[in-house]
Amino acid sequence: MYDIKKWRHIFKLDSAKHISDDDLDAICMSQTDAIMIGGTDDVTEDNVIHLMSRVRRYPLPLVLEISNIESVMPGFDFYFVPTVLNSTDVAFHNGTLLEALKTYGHSIDFEEVIFEGYVVCNADSKVAKHTKANTDLTTEDLEAYAQMVNHMYRLPVMYIEYSGIYGDVSKVQAVSEHLTETQLFYGGGISSEQQATEMAAIADTIIVGDIIYKDIKKALKTVKIKESSK
């Protein structure tokens, strides 16, 4: 079993987006710690299994971040289950999880399931609109969510998600200072080695996604953060 606590860098692939064989090879051979397959819309069983079969040729951990029950399938090393803490819709807190457990609970290996305390911060993002997230958050709000995740819910991961834009470094820093046990994931807008380095100095793990589809060379440079330690 892989130890996610050791992961500093994850490439996140969108199952609904095209990626060439050459670019996928470069991503999977880049020394990233893991590949995560996710997405917000058009996530289907067919496109997830197609992308999974392409990535499975490479010897690195493969994660499915669950966005709907229909696309869940065996074959992944981990299943990351988001609970969107700032969503106004209970379905994104535990409703989807409830349905998944009713359907698959008898066959789940819970050692493979990682619960993520998500906080969505970009009001204009697809994920914010889809999850009906309240993104008007102060630093104090984020600190309270961090305490909730770390001390009360005791979740293994807190994911600060800016999805499409580069986040407020001071707010991410404030969250980090309140997490003593929970692993901090940061994702959103990382499009350069400099940004990757800046966020990797604060978060335990950075998630790099959109830039893969815009500029593969810039995406690959973000892996250089592994050459330094937090």
Swiss-Prot record:
Transport found in the keyword field: no
Annotated pathway: Membrane lipid metabolism; glycerophospholipid metabolism
Record EC number: 2.5.1.n9
Ligand binding (sn-glycerol 1-phosphate): K12, Y159, I160, E161, Y162, S163, G164, G189, G209, D210
Record key words, sorted: Lipid biosynthesis, Lipid metabolism, Magnesium, Metal-binding, Phospholipid biosynthesis, Phospholipid metabolism, Transferase
Chain sites annotated for binding Mg(2+): D14, T40
One BP annotation, GO: glycerophospholipid biosynthetic process
InterPro entries the record matches: GGGP/HepGP_synthase_I, GGGP/HepGP_synthase_sf, GGGP_HepGP_synthase
Catalysis: reaction(s): sn-glycerol 1-phosphate + all-trans-heptaprenyl diphosphate = 3-heptaprenyl-sn-glycero-1-phosphate + diphosphate
Needed cofactors: Mg(2+)
A GO molecular-function annotation: magnesium ion binding
Membership in a protein family: Belongs to the GGGP/HepGP synthase family. Group I subfamily.
Function: Prenyltransferase that catalyzes in vivo the transfer of the heptaprenyl moiety of heptaprenyl pyrophosphate (HepPP; 35 carbon atoms) to the C3 hydroxyl of sn-glycerol-1-phosphate (G1P), producing heptaprenylglyceryl phosphate (HepGP). This reaction is an ether-bond-formation step in the biosynthesis of archaea-type G1P-based membrane lipids found in Bacillales.
Subunit-structure text: Homodimer.
HAMAP family per record: GGGP_HepGP_synthase
Designated name of the protein: Heptaprenylglyceryl phosphate synthase
Species annotation: Staphylococcus aureus (strain bovine RF122 / ET3-1)
Lineage: Bacteria, Bacillati, Bacillota, Bacilli, Bacillales
